[in-house]
Curated annotation (Swiss-Prot):
Pfam families: HPPK (PF01288)
Catalytic activity annotation: 6-hydroxymethyl-7,8-dihydropterin + ATP = (7,8-dihydropterin-6-yl)methyl diphosphate + AMP + H(+)
Annotated metabolic or biological route of this protein: Cofactor biosynthesis; tetrahydrofolate biosynthesis; 2-amino-4-hydroxy-6-hydroxymethyl-7,8-dihydropteridine diphosphate from 7,8-dihydroneopterin triphosphate: step 4/4
Domain of life: Bacteria
Function: Catalyzes the transfer of pyrophosphate from adenosine triphosphate (ATP) to 6-hydroxymethyl-7,8-dihydropterin, an enzymatic step in folate biosynthesis pathway.
NCBIfam families: folK
PROSITE patterns: HPPK
InterPro entries with a match to the protein in the record: Hppk, Hppk_sf
One GO molecular-function entry: ATP binding
Source organism (scientific name): Pseudomonas putida
Name of the protein in its database record: 2-amino-4-hydroxy-6-hydroxymethyldihydropteridine pyrophosphokinase
EC number per UniProt: 2.7.6.3
Keywords: ATP-binding, Folate biosynthesis, Kinase, Nucleotide-binding, Transferase
């Protein structure tokens, strides 16, 4: 059985638009997962002063993976594209976050869904 998941993408280092385009391709290659739709790219300010603006997008995925398995796949894509997590809200080559996982509410140490930065 597949469910619909929404993934937020963001980058503010090393050609952000190209990072996101590569991430869309990688998302479509994840096991038991299909990229259904991709938003246009848009720009947002960094949460911390002095950092470059972020290029962002959202992907809709149909996946048969469990939430933590999808998270592991997203982190593998981040790592493949050189993402380094040095500081919270710091600059990122690529940041992939599960925003929604069907209608599930998850509160686990590694994963909180809906994503804690989503607002009604």
């Amino acid at each position: 059985m597949t469910i619909r998941a929404y993934v937020g993408l963001g980058s503010n280092l090393d050609s952000p638009a190209e990072q996101l385009r590569s991430a869309f391709q990688a998302l479509d290659q994840v096991e038991a997962t299909r990229l259904v739709a991709a938003s246009a790219l848009y720009t947002s300010d960094s949460l911390l002063p002095g950092q470059p603006x972020y290029t962002n997008a959202v992907a809709a995925l149909d996946t048969a993976l469990a939430p933590l398995a999808l998270l592991d796949a997203l982190q593998a894509i981040e790592n493949d594209q050189g993402x380094v997590r040095k500081e919270r809200w710091g600059p990122r080559t690529l940041d992939l976050d599960i925003l929604l996982f069907s209608d599930q509410v998850l509160d686990q140490p590694r994963l909180k869904v809906p994503h804690y930065h989503m607002h009604a």
